[in-house]
């Protein structure tokens, strides 16, 4: 997935009210407010002075003319902070059949209603194969070098999704909990059970009921984001 417009570098001044970020543009020192499309805590990613990358827009319907897309760790690694992008990134990979364990499916349908007033991120289908229900979570937390974690805050909604996936597995479908690590500096994944023990318990229950788990890495640059290889899950 390529960004729609060229990203511009900036320095973060502060992130507040979850969805707002005051920044200073590198180019001219202008002070602007950007949209932060991330409802999580963004632990370790929003310190004042952090180098970030913004995507400008000229949409007259949007009050904020920049969207915060990346954190630049200034060591060659990036983190994608926009939680609306992983589904776009993964859809491209699924349609191109680049996700090995799901490459047998030719039909990819996003946002299909299921469960208790929920929508599954992707429903995959193919003649001769059981339907595959795929729920996607964006992973940005890393508290230990090289290790990604989820979640970065309490997520009752996430636990509900696991329960609904387990119901699909029990009904004879494939049900996949897919964690997309939006960091280029992580080589393993685990659950942040200390942050949300209820989610960790729901994960274990769902796995015992037949839910498959998959973690994928990403290649991230200021030009775009694409799915990389599988990352081992260590629980």
UniProtKB/Swiss-Prot annotation:
Any single Pfam family the record assigns to this protein? SfsA_N
Q: Which GO terms describe its molecular function?
A: DNA binding
Disulphides: none
Gene3D superfamilies this protein is in?
Answer: 2.40.50.580, 3.40.1350.60
NCBIfam families, A to Z: sfsA
Q: Cite the HAMAP family for this sequence.
A: SfsA
Q: Which family does it belong to?
A: Belongs to the SfsA family.
Q: What is this protein called?
A: Sugar fermentation stimulation protein homolog
| Organism, as annotated | Roseobacter denitrificans (strain ATCC 33942 / OCh 114) (Erythrobacter sp. (strain OCh 114))
Q: Which gene encodes it?
A: sfsA
